[in-house]
Amino acid sequence: MKNNKIIIFDTTLRDGEQALGSSLGINQKLQIALALENLGVDVIEAGFPVSSQGDFKAVQKIASKVKNSTICALSRALDKDIDMAYEALKVAKHFRIHTFIATSTLHIQDKLKKDFDEILSMAKRAIIRARSYTDDVEFSCEDAGRTPIDNLCFMVENAIKAGAKTINIPDTVGYTLPSEFANIIKILFNKVPNIDKAIISVHCHNDLGMATGNSLSAILQGARQIECTINGLGERAGNCALEEVVMAIKTRKDYLQGFYTDIKCENISKTSKLVSAITNESIPSHKAIVGSNAFSHSSGIHQDGVLKNRQTYEIISPSAIGIHENRMLMTARSGRAMIKTCLENLGYDENTYNLDDVYERFLRLADKKGQVYDYDLEALMFLSYESEEENEFVLEKLSVISGNIPTACVCMRIKEELKTEACTGNGPVEAVFNCIARITNLKPVLKAYSINAKSSGVDAQGQVDVDLEFKGRKFHGKGLSTDVIEASAQAFVSAYNAIYRSLKVEERKMA
């Protein structure tokens, strides 16, 4: 085919939302839709209007606000669904009605209790009704991956005759393998006589981990639309991840025949984080493209390679998706080259220190802490081993009262002196933070706060990680407890001790 543009159809707000424990609010959905528009998504599937009044209103509001993306709504092959979709969409500058019906023998017989001819008739009738509202109609053959190929070809041919401009071939249960799914698309192009009258779309689920692979294999056989979600959100194991297919197409143009998308890749990272925050679905650290470890290197061999030439272990530049740094994690696996480079970045000439000595001390600290930060490394240059391990601030006691005015009382030991303060805050965590700031007489800014469960059950331990900014530098702290407020206090105190050690280093520099 001459047109190598791949249309990106995002269904985060419809299929992606089905994976969430609770529905998103209208304003939350609008916020995501506007981010998708800014990302350059061609088609935004905003919801399923007939499913609830809330979904109807959300689709309607998105349709009224988004101007640069086509807004799509889903409907079953039923008149009431299609009519409701139109009512929600009609205010949009560009809109699409997406209707579907199952085509696999299993679904037709066991779920719908009908035969193939009845399903064919329903599909054609639905497409014709949708066409009465708009020329932009998409039809999906649900469970196409398990539909007998002759039936699928016949359904697609008749759907195009009825007026569908986009035909979607979903691997609804993530059953097919890439070569198998590619062959389905290939057969459609070979056997459906009017296939050139429509755009072929694919919608792949990730039950066997094949969603991205199946989608890419399909465009090699002629598909020109990929349906996907931010962070791969979706029912069961999720959907094809937008960030994965887009960056695969961008990175492997040599193999993927010059295909391209209109996605503004530099907005991928921030869109991923926004969706994660709004949906309260954390991004796995090892997630391709957008995971926190996607551009991290901790192995000494890898770090040495990246320091010499980033392409040795990075096939994508972090800046390509809007990340302006790659993380070179200092751990016990890091080599001397990494430590030397970090010290150079901190301004230390190699003639002013003994690398072997610093590296030995670094390993002792890394074995204890796990991850070492630049301020820890700098402390190695000026402080004795005992001073490195010394904590100026120690949390002794903590009590919190929640309610209309959250209040915390914190007792800390500073050297041999006990100091106690009570403070209020917008919540118990802020109240604790205010207490510690007052006791230490240090005023950092809280830049990041996260909680992760480290076990399950009612006695689960929660790990709190915080980043505090002080004098233009970030300091990390970590706490672990079955009480999340106590874990927060531990994390704050940990970061405050890092700040204190950095101040001692500054004093030594000035001496």
Curated annotation (Swiss-Prot):
Query: Entry's Gene3D superfamilies?
Result: 1.10.238.260, 3.30.160.270, Aldolase class I
Q: List every stretch annotated Regulatory domain.
A: 394-511
Read off the Pfam families from this record: HCS_D2, HMGL-like, LeuA_dimer
- Classification lineage: Bacteria, Pseudomonadati, Campylobacterota, Epsilonproteobacteria, Campylobacterales
Q: Kindly report the protein's main subcellular placement as a broad class.
A: cytoplasm
Entry annotated with the keyword Transferase: yes
Catalysis: reaction(s) = 3-methyl-2-oxobutanoate + acetyl-CoA + H2O = (2S)-2-isopropylmalate + CoA + H(+)
The reply on keyword Cytoplasm is: yes
Top-tier EC class = transferase
Check the record and name the InterPro entries matching this protein.
2-IPM_HCS-like (IPR050073), 2-isopropylmalate_synth_dimer (IPR013709), AIPM/Hcit_synth_CS (IPR002034), Aldolase_TIM (IPR013785), LeuA/HCS_post-cat (IPR054691), LeuA_allosteric_dom_sf (IPR036230), LeuA_bact_synth (IPR005671), PYR_CT (IPR000891)
Q: Share an example GO biological-process annotation for this protein.
A: L-leucine biosynthetic process
As for family, the record states: Belongs to the alpha-IPM synthase/homocitrate synthase family. LeuA type 1 subfamily.
Q: Which residues form the Pyruvate carboxyltransferase domain?
A: 6-269
* HAMAP family with a match to the protein in the record: LeuA_type1 (MF_01025)
EC annotation?
Answer: 2.3.3.13
What's an example of a GO molecular-function annotation for this chain?
manganese ion binding
List where in the cell it is found. Cytoplasm
Q: What is this protein called?
A: 2-isopropylmalate synthase
Specify the superkingdom: Bacteria
Known role? Catalyzes the condensation of the acetyl group of acetyl-CoA with 3-methyl-2-oxobutanoate (2-ketoisovalerate) to form 3-carboxy-3-hydroxy-4-methylpentanoate (2-isopropylmalate).
Q: Provide one Gene Ontology cellular component.
A: cytosol
Q: How does it assemble?
A: Homodimer.
**Pathway where this protein functions:** Amino-acid biosynthesis; L-leucine biosynthesis; L-leucine from 3-methyl-2-oxobutanoate: step 1/4
Which residues does the annotation say bind Mn(2+)? 15, 203, 205, 239
